Regions:
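Transmembrane alpha-helices and adjacent helix-loop boundaries
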Residues: 1-332
Length: 332
């Protein structure tokens, strides 16, 4: 078990190291793409805390993401750069407060009712920015000046913004990994496995679920802030149910119950999107990239029930099964 645990974190450490080295060898397009994927990975980990770790299938994660992004733009002056030290916490806090409100009501329901309530609250937030001038309507709004931290941190530099995002990706992973290995995380695992048994053991599960929901919303707000700063633009589609659905696909594709699965799923999902959108590879079929992406995801889920994190185990079993029985006896 210790070797397995060490191996998992060694793999994750190598991935983080590779991402840290990428700006020195990657193109400007690649830098922008990987920055976007890292933001989606942070967002996917926030949902993994709910779905994979607590057993709460939330269909409104995009709302918290969008709130973090809109706060970053709406609270930024049009004539100068905002101070990063207060704008970033404001985005996280706004998303967390809305998550606290949504969670306080939705967590009193279960199953499909919980899914529908979270979706309803997400759509409410979507239409607030879609149908009013507050969020620029369907046109969205621009971030004219990216936030700064004096002369120390200039996020207008693509490499600086990349490393800024990378730091928060690593921080999110470490924070959630420590959280899930704490007493709080063990209670969440117990709720996922059998909530009634946890209640019978004397645990009041509602506060734990609400704390997890609020934490998840705050991290989603962090991802939204990073996305707004990277693109310099936000629109209502950031809050649409399509993004919430895509996030669920990411964590299922990567492997539920694993933080590294959320990261792997985010990378796999976006790379598959870019692959099937390539007209240089697929020609006219690239216009129908959703078909290729859909069939590939279905195949991955069918062949890899544990997600992409389970791929090494599947390959190991197939290799062991393909060896002659006599050879296996000799190896033993």
């Amino acid at each position: 078990m210790d070797k397995l645990f060490t191996g998992k974190f060694l793999f994750t450490g190598l991935v983080f190291a590779g991402l840290a080295l990428y700006p020195f060898i990657g193109s400007s397009y690649g830098l922008d793409l990987v920055s976007k994927i890292m933001i989606y990975a942070i967002l996917a980990m926030s949902l993994e805390l709910l779905v994979g770790s607590t057993g709460l299938v939330c269909f409104g994660q995009a709302a918290f993401f969008g709130i973090g992004a809109y706060i970053a733009v709406l609270f930024s002056p049009e004539s100068e750069s905002a101070n990063l030290l207060w704008l970033l916490p404001a985005s996280i806090l706004a998303a967390a407060v809305y998550a606290l409100f949504v969670g306080a009501l939705s967590l009193r329901t279960k199953g499909v009712y919980f899914i529908m309530v979270t979706l309803a609250f997400a759509q409410m937030a979507y239409y607030v920015v879609h149908d009013t001038k507050l969020g620029g309507g369907t046109d969205g709004i621009y971030l004219y000046f990216k936030p700064i931290l004096g002369s120390v941190l200039d996020l207008n530099n693509p490499k600086t913004l990349y490393f800024f995002t990378w730091v928060f990706l690593v921080w999110t992973f470490v924070f959630l990994a420590m959280l899930l290995r704490s007493h709080f995380g063990r209670v969440l695992a117990g709720i996922r496995i059998n909530e009634q048994r946890m209640r019978a053991s004397g645990f009041s599960t509602y506060p734990y679920k609400l704390a997890a929901f609020t934490t998840s919303g705050g991290i989603a707000g962090l991802a939204g802030f990073l996305f707004a700063v990277k693109d310099g633009f936000v629109n209502p589609e950031m809050m649409s149910w399509h993004l919430s659905g895509a996030l669920l696909i990411m964590i299922i594709l990567g492997g539920l119950g694993h933080l590294r699965g959320a990261i792997i799923g985010a990378f796999a999902f976006v790379f598959l999107q870019e692959f099937f959108k390539s007209s240089a590879i697929f020609g006219e079929f690239a216009k129908h990239w959703q078909l290729g992406l859909g069939f590939t995801i279905i195949a991955c889920v069918a062949l890899l029930p544990k997600g992409l994190v389970g791929l090494p185990e599947v390959l190991r079993k197939r290799l062991d099964g393909s060896r002659p029985r006599d050879a296996q006896v000799v190896l033993k």
